[in-house]
Amino acid sequence: MKISLSLQQDFRSPELELKRAQLKKIIETTLRHVGYKEDCEIGIACVDLEESHQLNLQYREKDKPTNVLSFPSDIPEEVLPMLDALPLGDLVICIPVVLQEALEQKKTAQNHFAHLLVHGVLHLLGYDHETSDEDAEEMEGLEIEILAKLNIANPYQE
């Protein structure tokens, strides 16, 4: 499986260093865990509070910034055979929210970012935690298993 990663860092923080190789490892671990084997493309944009707030309001009608937004690709079926790699979609991650949540939850910024990246990739693959309790449990279970493979503790454990 080949992963093409587009990383746009509109907001950077010395508290959270993002390395392309590490991001690809997290994405690949997530994809392999759920049985995904195709070459793919994923975009990640790291943004500030204002942009996250605006996008969250525009696309989810929630009037506040959020940690991660997922925008699955909407490629017509007839176009897919013409592509070398499947565009899975884009993730927008708000770095200030990640840093604040990590602090509040007593986690490292790196580990919390990894969790949100796993969470976002699962959304790009069609997983959803807002449709039912069963779906939420399934998604959380997958996140815990994937993060364990990356030597990251269960993010839902107090």
Swiss-Prot record:
Its main location: cytoplasm. Binds 1 zinc ion. GO terms for molecular function: metalloendopeptidase activity; RNA endonuclease activity; zinc ion binding. The keyword Nuclease applies. GO terms for biological process: rRNA processing. Single strand-specific metallo-endoribonuclease involved in late-stage 70S ribosome quality control and in maturation of the 3' terminus of the 16S rRNA. This is Endoribonuclease YbeY. It comes from Acinetobacter baumannii (strain AYE).
